Swiss-Prot record:
HAMAP family: SecA (MF_01382). This is Protein translocase subunit SecA. GO terms for cellular component: cell envelope Sec protein transport complex; cytosol; plasma membrane. The keyword NADP does not apply. It catalyses: ATP + H2O + cellular proteinSide 1 = ADP + phosphate + cellular proteinSide 2. Keywords: ATP-binding, Cell membrane, Cytoplasm, Membrane, Nucleotide-binding, Protein transport, Translocase, Translocation, Transport. The lineage of its organism: Bacteria, Bacillati, Mycoplasmatota, Mycoplasmoidales, Mycoplasmoidaceae. Belongs to the SecA family. Its EC number is 7.4.2.8. GO terms for biological process: intracellular protein transmembrane transport; protein import; protein targeting; protein transport by the Sec complex.
Length: 890
């Protein structure tokens, strides 16, 4: 994602000013557009497309295009976009975050912005939080764009692959964030490029952007493979953690991450009978103990998860919804299962993974809309390069937000909440109560039952009735308890007579860690200028105070009576605390992206290379490059121990023959007296020649398909292993925090080494697999003793050649000391004239071994390859005996 440096110095007000000016220019064209016939209006789309083809930009045609689509929407649906919707559409088109209050018409705003970008014919994605919204909005958009010859698709789970491809080939595609992310991962696992579904990541508009880009930013999308089935260690770790006392571990109150103290570490080493918990061989045990600590000391049943039918179901921290089909990764889910004593599911191997942060940053242009984003504006700018621009409401917000009620303890707070509900309920004013957890909603539910107050409960345990419950939440006399679930994808409309009673009354039972979530709850009331009110009930027993309370707050708590009080000091303290928590959470997400950026770059390199392999018409050059890469490291392992610049010819020849050429004859003499560089060139030539011969037999087309299958398989296998190694590195790097280098720097350095190892492994396995198809059925039978004799003969021949040169220089007969057996079989030494030995080598022996090809000229290496030391000695003795009947010693 490219950084727009202008945004770093451009405040939201400046963007809003430009957006307002553009909206007024669009509005000035409404009469002109209204005067056009349907045919004239609809033909404008083709005109815009041609303008863009003629080097115009979308900004050049923005005003007229917005005016056209505004009129088209009016003629098709009867809805005429407000000025604020035009402003919001401008902000979205510019790739920024449009903050629009509930009920301000975000759906139509997205249609306006999408139309302008659809004209580029590169595809626009509108991302929603659930399939219901995606289908609903896609159907509405389809009716509008059909008249303009523009296509609209809806990508859903369980669609057939060809239907998914059709959806993504449309000019506009509605999809959920999770299905879009998984389709991206699946696209990078296909074996045929034509099977890819997403044609490109051009422009995405994220509806409820704060939920997807902030709340779920750290959520990894994971495609799993074959599971790991060793369950014993999960129970062992859980049983150990059960034995710990409070002095054995500590919990960071800000990050909520547990860790063992020195005492706990000692106890663990004694319990598991190991010397050092931090040894690499114990990294898996350390990881499982950490997960067990989180499951036992941090996670609570009814808050982070619920147990249903012996299954662990994750509860969304922000919405209270059950995250269907989700599980904690890295073995944490299994740790929770061990804690709850439910059947442990196998921990899957990660085949492909990406976080929402990394995925959405890959789009060339990214924009978002939501009712609450301003409090996270710094994060959106730094991570997603989006300026949050608050768009004015079409009508003034007249909701009354009352000061918080604060209490000394939980018991008094809940009693006050029930009393407030009872009092307001008697008037008939509709009430929406937001709780922080499923457990709190169940507690309040029981208290209201005791008061005989009729109400509905909306939480993770009955989410199936969500639409029905929300539909009645604005009716007179209704009381609805919700775990923040009403804040996403819902619109509470006031029933008949509710306005006269004061509109929807929102009660918050605790302040959330993020002010944004509090604002979402408040925003359920007062939509489109409706009357309404809100109030929060807070106590020092709330989670926010427990985690971040200061000493003075705790001291004040001891002095306070149980009655509620209104204090500006505590309100300011609460706001400061929320800002502090938001900052901590931002730092955690920023830290995540620092680490994730490393893996994201590696993922991008692998996926791009994978695509090139899939579409290449000739992979010979790719295989040749891999062969060169592999041979470099392969030959290095056969250095001669006595001389590191030379190779060991026997070991290298055997390895080449066994591992690479599958039985093709390779002799040690081919590498005799070769440097590493020369040996690399020799091996590379042997491999390339063998591959070329195979291509000639198979034909280029067939060979290309074979190479593609081999390369893709090896890349996928190596990438899966690499992901596992990176996960272990990420978990283990914190163990080295005592070093002077930062954990992130260590992670960067080590990850590069792992990536290089993976690339080398891919090259090695590809070449070995390619070589295996060259001569797959040949048996390798190497006579090592014979190779030694050949090398010895080669050395002798070199000595002979040197002596021959010496003889030529000195004009004196050169002699060499030679061992041979006498007539009694005893080994003796004799100085033999070089001429005799040269004659012997060039004559009798060579002729005897190449009798069938007497005219063939052999070079010295080929001669040496055929020499047998024993034969030389025997022939030498025979020749001397014929010349001189008695041998004389010197």
């Amino acid at each position: 994602m490219l950084i727009n440096w202008f945004k770093l110095i451009s405040p939201k007000n400046r963007i809003l000013k430009r957006a307002t000016l553009a909206a007024k220019q669009v509005d000035a064209l409404k009469d002109e557009m209204r005067a056009l016939s349907d045919e004239q209006l609809f033909n404008k789309t083709e005109y815009f497309i041609n303008e863009l083809k003629n080097n115009k930009t979308t900004d050049d045609i923005l005003v007229e295009a917005f005016a056209v689509i505004r009129e088209v929407v009016y003629r098709e649906t009867g809805n005429f976009a407000y000025l604020v919707q035009l402003i919001g559409a401008y902000v979205v088109h510019q790739g920024d975050f449009s903050e629009m209050m509930t009920g301000e018409g975000k759906t139509l705003t997205l249609v306006l912005a999408a139309y302008l970008n659809m004209l580029e014919k590169k595809g626009v994605h509108i991302v929603t939080v659930n399939e219901y919204l995606a289908e609903r909005d896609a159907e509405q958009a389809r009716r509008i764009f059909a008249r303009l010859n523009l296509t609209v698709g809806c990508n859903k789970a369980n669609l057939a692959p060809h239907l998914k491809k059709e959806a993504f080939d449309c000019d506009l595609t509605y999809t959920t964030n999770s299905e879009l992310g998984f389709d991206y991962l699946r696209d990078n696992m296909v074996r045929n490029y034509r099977d890819k579904k997403i044609r490109g990541l051009h422009f995405a508009i994220v509806d409820e952007g704060d939920s997807i880009l902030i709340d779920e930013a750290r959520t990894p999308l994971i495609i799993s493979g074959q599971p790991k089935k060793d369950f014993r260690m999960y129970f062992d770790a859980d049983k150990f953690v059960e034995t710990l006392s409070e002095s054995d571990y500590k919990i960071d109150p800000e990050s909520r991450s547990p860790s063992l103290t020195e005492k706990g570490i000692t106890k663990a080493e004694k319990h598991f009978k190991i010397n050092n918990l931090f040894d690499l061989e114990n990294s898996d045990l350390f990881h499982k103990i950490g997960n067990a600590l989180t499951a036992r000391k941090i996670f609570q049943n009814g808050k982070e998860y619920i147990v249903r039918d012996d299954k662990i179901l994750i509860v969304d921290h922000f919405t209270g919804r059950i995250l269907e089909g989700r599980s904690y990764n890295g073995g944490l889910h299994q740790a929770v299962q061990a804690k709850e004593r439910v059947p442990i599911e196998a921990e899957n191997v990660v085949v492909a993974t990406v976080t929402y942060q990394s995925f959405f940053r890959m789009y060339k242009k990214l924009a978002a809309v939501s009712g609450t984003a301003l409090t996270e504006s710094e994060e959106f700018l730094k991570i997603y390069n989006m300026v949050v621009v608050p768009v004015p409401t079409n009508r003034p917000v007249i909701r009354k937000d009352h000061p918080d009620f604060m209490f000394g303890n939980l018991k008094t707070k809940w009693e006050a909440v029930v009393n407030e509900i009872e009092k307001i309920h008697k008037t008939g004013q509709p009430i929406l109560v937001g709780t922080g957890s499923v457990e709190d909603s169940e507690t309040l539910h029981q208290m209201l039952l005791e008061k005989n107050i009729m109400h509905e409960v909306l939480n993770a345990k009955n989410h199936a009735r969500e639409a029905h419950i929300i539909a009645k939440a604005g009716e007179v006399g209704s009381v609805t308890i919700s775990t923040n679930m009403a804040g996403r994808g819902t619109d509470i409309k006031l029933g008949k007579g509710a306005k006269e009673l004061g509109g929807l009354y929102v009660i918050g039972t605790e302040r959330h860690e993020s002010r944004r979530i509090d604002n979402q709850l408040r925003g359920r009331s007062g939509r489109q200028g409706d009357i309404g009110e809100s109030r929060f009930f807070i106590s020092f027993g709330d989670p926010l105070f427990k985690r971040f309370a200061q000493d003075r707050i705790l001291k004040a708590q001891e002095k306070l009576a149980s009655d509620y009080f209104d204090s500006k000091f505590f309100s300011r303290f609460l706001t400061m605390t929320q800002k502090k928590v938001e900052s901590v959470n931002f730092d955690m997400r920023k830290n995540l992206i620092d680490y994730d950026h490393v893996l994201a770059n590696q993922r991008e390199l692998i996926y791009k290379q994978r695509d090139k392999i899939l579409i290449a018409s000739d992979l010979t050059e790719v295989v040749d490059r891999m062969a060169q890469n592999f041979v470099e490291g392969f030959v290095e392992t056969f250095k001669d121990q006595a001389n590191q610049t030379m190779v060991n010819p026997i070991e290298l020849s055997i390895a080449v023959q066994k591992e690479l050429l599958q039985g093709e004859e390779v002799t040690a003499s081919q590498f005799y007296n070769q440097t590493l560089l020369a040996a690399k060139q020799t091996v590379l030539k042997l491999v390339k020649d063998a591959i070329s011969k195979k291509i000639e037999v198979m034909t280029v087309g067939i060979a290309n398909n074979v190479f593609r299958d081999i390369i893709i398989q090896q890349m996928d296998d190596a990438w899966i292993h690499h992901l596992d190694q990176m996960l272990k590195l990420r978990e283990g790097v914190s163990l080295r925090s005592l070093e002077q280098t930062s954990p992130l720097n260590i992670y960067v350095e080590e990850s590069k080494k792992l990536f290089d190892l993976m690339l080398n492994k891919i090259a090695k396995n590809v070449i070995l697999a390619v070589c295996a198809i060259i001569n797959p059925t040949r048996n390798v039978d190497i006579n090592v003793e014979q190779e030694h004799r050949r090398l010895e003969a080669l050395k002798r021949l070199e000595e002979i050649k040197k002596l021959e040169e010496l003889q030529n220089n000195n004009n004196e007969p050169a002699k060499v000391l030679f061992k041979f057996p006498d007539q009694h079989g005893n080994m003796i030494e004799r100085e033999v004239p070089v001429d005799n030995l040269i004659q012997l080598v060039d004559g009798q022996i060579i002729q005897a071994q190449v009798a069938e090809e007497p005219k063939q000229e052999l070079n010295q290496l080929e001669k040496a390859d055929q020499l047998d030391q024993t034969l030389i000695e025997a022939k030498l003795a025979e020749q001397q005996e014929q010349k001189n009947n008695s041998a004389t010693d010197k």
